[in-house]
Amino acid sequence: MDKQNLYLGIDIGSTTFKAVLLSGDGTVLRTVYKRTQPVEAGKVACTGHCSACGACSGGSVKRLALEFLKVAGISSFSDISSFVVTGSQIVEDTKKFLPYDFQVSEVTAHVAGAKFLHPDVDAIIDCGGQDSKCMVYNLPMNLWTSMMSGVCAAGTGSFLDSVAQKLGVRIEDVADRVNYDSKTEFSSVCAVLSATSINKFKNRVPLGDLLAGACKAQARTILNSVGQLLLNAPGRKILFQGGVAFNKAVAYFLGKLTGSQIIIPQYHEVMGALGAAVIARQLHDLKASGHLNLEKVVYEPTRGKSVALRIKSTKHDFFSKDETKPLVWRNLFFPTEILNAMDCRVRTLETYAALFGRRADKVKEALGRAAQKGFDGQTCSFLRMLEGMDLDKPDFIVSTVQPCQQAERVFADLAREYKIEDRLYSLQTPINAHSRNAVEVMADGLAESVFEMEKAFGRKMDLGRLEEACVLSNEAAALAKKCQELRFTSPPLVRGSEAIYNAIVFSQLWGRQDLVDIQKAYYEELLMKKEWAEKRYKIGDTHRLLWLHLPPFYDTRHLDFIETTCNAPIVFEETNFVGWEPLDPKDPYRSLAKKLLQSGFLDPALRVEYVKRAVPAGQFNGVILYTHGFGRCSLADRALSKHLREELDAIHVPLLTLEGDCMDASIDPCSTTTKIASFAEALNLNRYGNIFGKLNETK
C-alpha cells in the first residue's frame, strides 16, 4: 500500500471482533466483522512477550488484528498513523497485545461513526451482544446524552441468539422468517430464561409467530432499558446500529413502537470500530498541531490535621467499650444532638456497616449469613450487612420512618432478635418538608423519644447539655458552610474521591466539640489549598462535577477513574452539603425537627431544589447520581432520578446516573466505566471542542 496516513479502529465486544481501516482522506479502506469464541483451554492472559501463537485471548485478538492489516497490505502496527480501540472487552492487559494510542468509550465511538456517515444524525440506538445503548443529541446542552443497559442481557443480542438456537434457526435467517402481522407476545425477555418463554408457545403457534414475538420483545426491551431519551421526540430519524441491526425485524418493531423512522446505516455492524478510526484521525491531527494539553489536574498534597481528627473520633465512637454509657443504635437521620447531650455511645448502623466495606471477606460473610436468614438482593446491602454481622446489644434503638422504610423494618427485626422490642423508638417523619404541622409532630416525637430513653437509662436529660449541644452543632454547621462556600467558589481544592467519605450530613458528631474542631481544621486546610490552587488554575479551567448520594465503599476505583483517568474533578459532594437554618438552643426539639426536614434527604422535592441551586453557585457542568441498590434505594430511586433529570435538563446541565451497590462489589456492572468515560468525553467535546481534553491557549 502506498505511504499515506492510515487510521485503525478496533472494537472488541463480548461476541465479536470488529475493525475498520480509514485513509487520510476519510475513505473506508477495509472492514471486518467476526464472531469470536471463548478460549477453550490454556491461558487466557500472559505477559504478551510472545503473542505469536494466539492461544490466549489477548494473543488471539492480536492475531486477528494483524491478519486484518495483512489483507490490506500492511505488515505491522508501526505503519498505522493512529490507532484507537473501544469495546466492552478492552481490559488492562489489552495494551500488551495492541499498541493503541487511545481507548474511547463505546458510546462516543458509535456517535463518531454515525456522524461520519450521517452528519445530521441526532438519535442513535446501538444493540450489541452484551448491552444496548441510546444516544441523543441535546441541542440546548450542546452535547450527546446517553443511556446504557445494566447487568441484564435482555434487549441485547444474547437474547435473540438464545431464541434462534432454541428454535433451530440461523440468527441470520430470523428476519426473513418472521410473521410481521403476528399478535404473539412474549411475557419474558430474559436471555437466560428465554427457553421457558419459548417452550410455553412453541407447540401451539407457528415458527414465524414465535420469531415475531421474540423480535417484538427485543424491541420493547431495548426501549424500556435505554429508550427513555426518545420519549419526547416521536417522528425523528433514529439510526439503528450494532450486530442486532442485521435483524431487520427488530428495526421494524422499533419503528412501530417509537413512531420514528428507523435507519440501518451502511457499516452498522462495525460502527464502533468506524468511530474509533474517525477518532484516531482526530487524535493524530490534534497531536500534530501541538494544541492538545493532556496534563492532569493536581492537588495540594498535604494531609491535614482534620483527617487525623476524623480517624480518632471514628475509632473512639465505633469501637469504644465504655459500658458506663448507654449504647444507642441510630439510623442516619435521628438527631445526634439529643444522643450526645444524653452522653450515649452512639452507633450509626449504616455507617458501621460501611466501615467494613473494604474487607471483602467480612462483607461476603455478613451477606451470606443474611441470605440464610432470608434477606436476599431485594434488601438493601447495608441492611443485609447488619442482619449478618455480630453487633453489640444496644440499650436503645432510634430511627426515622423516612426516608428508608425498609430500614425501619430491619431495625424492628433486629430489635426483636436482640429482645429489646420495647426499646425501639421510630420517629414519624413526613415525606414533605412543608406538610401541615410537620415541625410540631416531629418535635413532639423527639420529646417522646427522650422520655422513653430516660425511662430506659434511669436518668433525666440535662436540658443545659442539650442547649450546649445545639450551640456546638451551630458552630460546626457554620464552619461547614464556609468550607462549602470555599469549594463552590474555587478551583478544585481536594479530591472528591476522598472528601466524599467525610459525609458530614450523616455524622454522629453533631452536638460535640469534636465536629467543631474537625470542621475548623478542615476550613483552615481549604484556605491553604485555595491559595495553592489559584496559582495554577482558574475556576473555569477544569470540569466541575457534583456527586449525589453515597459512593461505593468497597474501593475508590470508579471515583479515581472519574478524577484521574477522565481528568474530571468531583468538586463537591451532596453528603457534605449543609442547608438547614441555625438551631434555637432555647427551643431544641422544634429546631432539630426543622433541621431534619431541611436536610433535603427526607423530602425528595427539596433535595432536587437544593441541587438546582447548587449548580450555578458551584459552577458545576455535570452531575453524577449513584443509584445504590440499582434504583431500589429510596434515596436514589427511579422517581428521584426522573425528577432530577427533568429539572437539570431545564437548566441545561447533564446528569449521569450510575447503577450499582455501595457494599456488594460482586454485582458491580461492567458498564460503569463506559458510562463514566462517555460522560467525560461528552463534557470534553462541549467545553474543549474535542473528546480528549483541554487545548493549549494559542496566542
Task: Briefly describe each language-model feature range.
Residues Y7-G59, L143-S146, G150-V151:
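Short glycine-rich, Thr/Ser-proximal phosphate-binding strand/loop in the N-terminal lobe
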Residues G87-V91, L230-L257, H268-G272:
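Glycine-rich phosphate-binding loops at beta-strand->alpha-helix junctions
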Residues Y100-V107, G255-L274, H652-V653, T657-E659:
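Conserved phosphate-binding/catalytic loops in two-lobed NTP-binding clefts
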Residues A112, G157-D161, Q266-K296:
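Glycine-rich phosphate-binding/hydrolytic loop that grips phosphoryl groups
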Residues S194-Q228, R607:
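Adenine-nucleotide phosphate-binding core of ATP-dependent small-molecule kinases
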Residues V298-P326, A443, A447, F451-W580, ...:
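A charged, amphipathic alpha-helical module
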Residues L332-F333, I338-V363, L546-K612:
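Redox- and metal-dependent alpha/beta enzyme cores, enriched for Fe-S-associated oxidoreductases
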